Structures are given as structure tokens and as C-alpha cells.
């Protein structure tokens, strides 16, 4: 699964881990995150994330 980096603060969203503190189950693909999901560290929207290898 992919990892996505916040271009603002560097937070890594790992699809394997999800974001359990914010109700996102492990295995949730980035494109399947709710539209109102934001970076848990800085509050940046999904549009500020880039896929990394």
C-alpha cells in the first residue's frame, strides 16, 4: 500500500496503518479518506498531500 506525505508539515499517512486516532481504519486507501479528513498534525487538506514511494 502507498504512503502520502503532507507538503506542509511532513506528516506521513501510511495506508497500512490508517489514522486510528481519527477513526480511519488500517488499510484505508488515501483516495477513500473522507473529503473532510485533514492532516492530524497541521490541519492541511488532502490536496496538500503527495504520494511517496
From Swiss-Prot:
Fe cation binds at residues 6, 9, 39, 42. Residues 1-52 form the Rubredoxin-like domain. Keywords: Electron transport, Iron, Metal-binding, Transport. Binds 1 Fe(3+) ion per subunit. Signal peptide: none annotated. Its cofactor is Fe(3+). GO terms for molecular function: electron transfer activity; iron ion binding. CDD domains: rubredoxin (cd00730). It comes from the Archaea. One of its GO terms (biological process) is alkane catabolic process. The keyword Mitochondrion does not apply. InterPro entries: Rubredoxin, Rubredoxin-like_dom, Rubredoxin_dom, Rubredoxin_ET, Rubredoxin_Fe_BS. Gene3D superfamilies: 2.20.28.10. The keyword Transferase does not apply. Belongs to the rubredoxin family. PANTHER family: RUBREDOXIN, RUBREDOXIN-1-RELATED. Rubredoxin is a small nonheme, iron protein lacking acid-labile sulfide. Its single Fe, chelated to 4 Cys, functions as an electron acceptor and may also stabilize the conformation of the molecule. This is Rubredoxin. The lineage of its organism: Archaea, Methanobacteriati, Methanobacteriota, Thermococci, Thermococcales.
Amino acid at each position: 500500500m502507498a504512503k502520502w506525505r503532507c507538503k506542509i508539515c511532513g506528516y506521513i499517512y501510511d495506508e497500512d496503518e490508517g489514522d486510528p486516532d481519527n477513526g480511519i481504519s488500517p488499510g484505508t486507501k488515501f483516495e477513500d479518506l473522507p473529503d473532510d479528513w485533514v492532516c492530524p498534525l497541521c490541519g492541511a487538506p488532502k490536496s496538500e498531500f503527495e504520494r511517496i514511494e
